[in-house]
Each structure stands twice: as structure tokens, then as C-alpha cells.
Amino acid sequence: MKHSLMLTVVLLLTPLAALQAAGLKRPNVVLIVCDDLNDYVAHLGGHPQARTPHMDALAHGGVSFRRSYCQDPICAPSRASFLTGIYPFRSGDFTFRPWFEFPVLQNSRTLMEHFRANGYYVVGSGKLMHHHRQSDWDEYPYKADYGPFAYDGKERVGHPSVPEPYRSIGPVDGSFGPLSDVPFGGRGGKGWIYGAWGKVKPMRYVNDDDRDPTPDERNARWAADRIGQFAREKDARPFFLAVGFIRPHTPMYAPKKYFDLFPLKSLQLPVIKPGDAADTHYRDVFSDEIKGLRYYRTLGQSYPTVEEGLKAFLQAY
């Protein structure tokens, strides 16, 4: 079975109340969120070798905001901020604590609630808020699933093809590679599994054209099918549909053909300036064992050279 990803976005820039007051038809709105996506998108120029034709086509048909930065460098508070319109310094939400535990956010309207209050039917799937709240949605078929994961017959593990000590970081952040590299050869109850915590659901893989869909592919298919269903329905209400993709967040697994697009020898690494962080307050706030620094150091220790480790990781990204 061939897998494809259909991305559709409509950006609503006019306040809904103003549209209603003017007697104009309210548009249907699709919101797409990608986790950990940086500016390595061709039209943004973040990396000279980036190949993102569908994102480029989407950008060329609309407006691209090149200086729109995240409100917080981790996903939970950043998502809570842009889906409520409240800065972290106003809400106090800076870490991974559930956003709805903060009084300011408890008493604020989310984007989803705002659409519903203006007569929209609100549906979503995948990873949108880091901490999901079902009451925000009329439909939400699939919660965030970071899978597939490598499974050793007992538990989720780092992918066996990733060298140590990086693999020991674990099944999420310590793993990347092509889907064709089935963990443990797929024998004896081992192989790929989906990522719902507390459950073990195998993901069937024969080859890249004969396999179960990844969670992101499943969400893309749901979004495309649901949009088609809306088009056939008689419901007079406009819809707000949001779909959240996990990738390129770790674990970075993808069909092999995408790895083949970027041979390791040809990859260009970004410039890394010696002592570039020395004039910042990074180490005044964080220790050398903070996740990012530790992961970077461990990646370099896992390959013959730091450059080889960075290229392997960059290829997967």
C-alpha cells in the first residue's frame, strides 16, 4: 500500500465576529502543527539541502512569517501559549506541567473553544496541546502517538542499529533510522510497535509499500478523509480541523527512500563556532548534564567522530 501525506492549510486572519457582522460566509479552517520543526524548510532557507516541495507550495500560495518564533523552547508551554494567546510570562507556564493547572489558562478560552463559540464544529487528531483535554473538541479520534518504537519482546528500547551509548538514551530520544531496518529482524514477537503507553500493538512491516501506516500517516489520512466527509455532509456549520504531526520529533523513523535522498557523505553540517555559547548565561542556568548538552556529547561519543554522529542524526531529521 502506498502512503501519502496531504497537507492543507487555511489561515484565518479576520476576526470571526467581524465576518459575522459583515454577513460574510465563515471559511472552513485547517490547522497543521509539526513537532520540533525548525527552519530546515527549503523556502525558509534554513539548510541549503532541504527538500520540502509540498511545504514550499503551501507557502507560495499564502503568507510565510519568517520571524514568527516560538514562545517557549519546549513544546508544552509553547503550544499552550499559541493555542490560548497568552504568553508564558503571563500564565507562569514554562515547563511540562499540564497547562490547565495554571489559573490564568484555566480561565482563558482556547482557540478551539473560540471557534466553537462562534458556531464552528471543532475536530482534531494527533499532537496539538501537549496535555490533551477532550472537552475542547467535538471529535478527537487519535491522541499523540510517538511510535513506531523498537520492541525487544518485553519493552520499548532504543533501536538496536543506533550505536551505544546514544542508544541507551532510550526509545524516544535515542532512536532513529529507516523503517526497513526492522528491530531484531521482526522475529519472536519483536519488531515495530505503536506508541500508546501501557499497550503493545504490533505495527506490521513487510516492506515500505506493504505495511501498517505510521501514526502520522494515520492522522494525515484521517484529516483528508474527514475533510472529504465534511464536503459531502449537509451540516451548515463551518468546521475547524486541526491535525498534529509528531515528526520530526524523535524517534526519527521514516521510509528508507527519504534517507536515500540525503547520502551521509554529501550532507552539509551547519557551522559550529567554538565557544559560541560562552558569552551567554546558558551555564549559569543549566548544568552540563542538561538534556541537550548531554545528548550532543553522547552522540559524539557513539561514532568515530562528532561529525559522523551529527551527519547520521541530521540525515534522519
Predicted regions and their residues:
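Bacterial N-terminal signal peptides
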Residues: 6-17
